[in-house]
Amino acid sequence: MSVSGDDSDDYFDHEIDDVIVPGTPDAVKSAQTDNRPAKRRRLDAGVFDESDISIDQGDGEDEFQSPDRRSVNAVQSEDVERTSKYKVFVPKRKNFQENIFVTQLTQPPSPPEMIRGPRWKKPGPEPLAPKPTTTTVDASHQPDQYYDEDKEIEAAIAASLRSFEEENGGNIPSTASRSTPALTAVAPSAALKEAAADVPFNLDDIPDDAFDSDLSLSPPRTTSQATRGPPVQSQFRTNRPLGLRQSTLFDMAARNSDIPSQRGEQILSPPEKNEPPTHHKLNEEAINTWVYPTNLGKTRDYQFNIAQRGLFHNLLVALPTGLGKTFIAATIMLNWYRWTKSAQIIFVAPTKPLVAQQISACFQVAGIPRSQTTMLTGEAAPGIRAEEWKSKRVFFMTPQTLVNDLKSGIADPKRIVLLVVDEAHRATGGYAYVEVVKFLKRYNKSFRVLALTATPGSTVESVQAVIDGLGIAKVEIRTEQSLDIREYVHARDTEVQTFKNSDEMVLCMELFTRTLQPLVDQLRNLNAYWGRDPMALTAFGLTKARQQWMGSDAGRNANLGLKGKVNAIFTVLASLAHAIDLLKYHGITPFYRHLLHFQSNTDGQKGGKYQRQIVQDESFKKLMNHLQPWTKNPEFIGHPKLEYLKQVVLNHFMDRGEGTAANGDQSQSATRIMIFVHFRDSAEEVVRVLKRYEPLIRPHVFVGQSSAKGSEGMDQKTQLSIVQKFKKGTYNTIVATSIGEEGLDIGEVDLIVCYDSSASPIRMLQRMGRTGRKRAGNIVLLLMQGKEEESYIKAKDNYEKMQQMIASGTRFTFHDDTSPRILPPGVRPVAEKRQIDIPVENTQADLPEPRKRARPPKRPPKKFHMPDDVETGFAKASSLTGKVTKKAETKKAVRKPTPEPVEVPALEEVLLTPGEQQDLERRYCHIGGTSPEFIRNPRVDAYPRLQSVPRPTKAIKHGSLTSRMIGTLQKMSKVSVDCERRYRKVLALESSKEIVDSVLSREPGSPAQNSGRLGKKPHAFKRPSATSRPNNVHVREDENEDNCTPELLSPEKLMSSFLEPHTERPPYSSQRSQDAFELDFPDVETLLNRSAERHVSRKRNRFVLDDDTEE
């Protein structure tokens, strides 16, 4: 808005011409009468100042206007100067700059609420320097006195470079020093200005180091403390792979002329590390060179550089399918085979077909002798595998077999020097790849890891898991857009075709919706599921909804009946959610097969309440009545994808002239098609439709090993035979599930058809990588509108984003510390390109598997391998601390004296004296008071029945003394009244035994005399067996009135017979009379001691054997 001629401060009193549209008569009139001062600038004669450059803001784009034809030195008229309101840009050079479209920010991202500020601010005016005398670039160009403009452009470029480096972590080599090596100079050089003005994007202008920007080869960064602060250390160590183009906003990434060209082959060397020498025996002559095979013809620079880096670092190689990952692995295996004398090299792949195809590549490329190579799988016996581990050096095997051999001790982990991992994106979690590397690190600190894959992962976490699981130190990644591999990747035309539901599918969805709606409504009423449309059910969504409801208060507090009802409904709907996916994305026929299987589970008494409710629903019956005749019709195609797929395949074969060859060559096809599906039902349906056009289309299904209901799996032998027939042309179309996505070399495929979309970028890229290897290929994606189309877009965007993150290297942490050098310090192998001589034995067609034997060798015993510097045996806990402690002197134990028996005191010493008895009564038994009271000793004879049994207790149990006292009283109560007669019997027997002992001691052949004469102990008596007869056994009998046999009866037996309880009831102690016991009989203890003293002699006297020596 313009200010009026007067000095009014009212901003609303403006002239009416402020709103006049230019170009109208009113505008012209206003322009003539307007007396506002025009912007004036001082111009030197024949010289344009830097302020002459202005940008036309009319159309909103930065467009450069064509130069005016008038001469710069011409005198401008005063009228033109008055009416001229705009200035035009007059370039100094003839080449015109094209439009530049910036697709990414050059500064770090910031929150939207923060004021961003200008990207670059024009610096203030600087004092003019004297004009250079001889600085002309071209005759047609203006003199080089406009260096102020160049300095402003250079400052803008430097600011853009700084922001770009800050965005990428500050670890990119500064290209500002390359494009503007002297920003502080007064007059930049002509070459610098020429590079600054070179804008057209031609291949010739691409710098030679666009792909080989190594940090170690970059020039030192020249920074000024006045313009930049101190460097900030990045959070993660950056490892930027090669093959990436880095340029500024104006494509200013000129290479310094002092650095030699890095485009093509590089010269790398092992890292300088302070590590102990390797335990592997190295070939001193071979380690000075490394061999690059030239058997395949032209040398590819990216293969040369990646192979060289993989020799010296634990490397993750991410190359698109068909770009020679196997060749890189074979080259690295060959060199480590040359460098070591007895070390072992292992190539692991997930499946046996992948292992088999890698063997042929290594035989024909690397030339490793077949006699030193073997292929081990779980089919080989452990004894055979043990022999192979002892004699061979190169192994091709599955990771599960390798884990078993390492754990059982068959394989020696210390001998392994190189581990090549194919399909390395599987190395996450507890997969066998991770277990192998962990096991090797425990015993071996000197081995190399080479990981091969086409897609490292779909998320940052999964890629980092691969890096951590394999101990990766460097990453080499290439995409199909990388310029150094573009000449080896043929064009691939990708066609994305979307479809809508057919009328038959809509009818099926309506009927199926009516069937499932009651169950969905029940879940909604219980707040267990919030969806309304049954066609939106998914197995994952139902599982998450069930978990949330079970974890909620309603689910936890619900009774068992309600919980069972909700679980049953969720289970039924989850089983039918798969049928919905089949109907939407795969066809009506797979949908009908699934419903038949669901219906068969309700036959008879099978199935639950809600499963039978669905089967008995009228809408379900009507649906099945519609599907049955449709699927029986061989001409019926139940999905629009399938109809389009048939047309695409037919058109492809007819365009390639399939079937026009001679009759003898009709079985061989020149072009091949591969179709990827997700389920086996879909694969069988596709094969059924395409087989109607045989022999033009010769399809075959290609599935995995596991068997399912209604579909048998394929073993590895069948898989390999199908692949070979597909390569030969017997089959020209393969319909494969996920088994055909990874790794298998299925030959040249000209057309890839993805029947369904995969939300995983890994699977999507594995599918697309099957074509475009040696010739151009086509890819057709068949997607349904809606969720499937969105999944494809998400997978594609996720893949591109992940490739950028992996290439930048700022989001990942690499493990340089676990990547050993292995080679001796100072050794720098030099590349040697030569033709490898292939041994004659490598031309054999069969695989190097160990032959099966009628009797396989015995499995060797388990061997426990120990890491280096391990102390075997037992160690004390005190020695683990590292401190040496002196052993304390052990004191000799004092010998304890032999215990001696104590003499039993006399009765007078134990009993109280009369004086002590009186004192006891006076002090403790007499209680003073009005009436005399005395404390008596407890009566043993009082209440005999109660004292002979333990009385009930509450808090404190009976002690041991009470238990012994009760037992004593019980034994005393068992003594009968006629004990006097029994005591007399015992005394009579004792006296008779003394007489018998004296008689036996006088006999000459008694054992006592024999033992005394010979000075030896008598032999122990052996009881005669039932079959043997004793020799001259004399049994002595003693006849008495009681007819007792002292040799056969012991005092214990006699006492036990005496002490047997009688049926008569013993009298109470108070009822017994003391008058009858006038005799002083010995006590029971005395009798037992006497019998025990003669117990041994009585046993020996039972049998008397004749002594043969006395005869």
UniProtKB/Swiss-Prot annotation:
Belongs to the DEAD box helicase family. DEAH subfamily. FANCM sub-subfamily. The keyword Acyltransferase does not apply. The gene is mph1. Keywords: ATP-binding, DNA damage, DNA repair, DNA-binding, Helicase, Hydrolase, Nucleotide-binding, Nucleus. It comes from the Eukaryota. It comes from Neosartorya fischeri (strain ATCC 1020 / DSM 3700 / CBS 544.65 / FGSC A1164 / JCM 1740 / NRRL 181 / WB 181). Interacts with the MHF histone-fold complex to form the FANCM-MHF complex. ATP binds at residues 319-326. Its main location: nucleus. Residues 1-81, 101-144, 210-240, 259-280, 836-898, 998-1047, 1092-1111 are annotated as: Disordered. Pfam families: Helicase_C (PF00271), ResIII (PF04851). Residues 132-143, 215-238 have a biased composition (Polar residues). GO terms for cellular component: nucleus. ATP-dependent DNA helicase involved in DNA damage repair by homologous recombination and in genome maintenance. Capable of unwinding D-loops. Plays a role in limiting crossover recombinants during mitotic DNA double-strand break (DSB) repair. Component of a FANCM-MHF complex which promotes gene conversion at blocked replication forks, probably by reversal of the stalled fork. This is ATP-dependent DNA helicase mph1. GO terms for biological process: double-strand break repair via synthesis-dependent strand annealing; interstrand cross-link repair. It is found in: Nucleus. Residues 852-864 have a biased composition (Basic residues). The lineage of its organism: Eukaryota, Fungi, Dikarya, Ascomycota, Pezizomycotina. InterPro entries: FANCM/Mph1-like_ID (IPR039686), FANCM_DEXDc (IPR044749), Helicase/UvrB_N (IPR006935), Helicase_ATP-bd (IPR014001), Helicase_C-like (IPR001650), P-loop_NTPase (IPR027417), UIM_dom (IPR003903). It is an enzyme of class 3 (hydrolase).
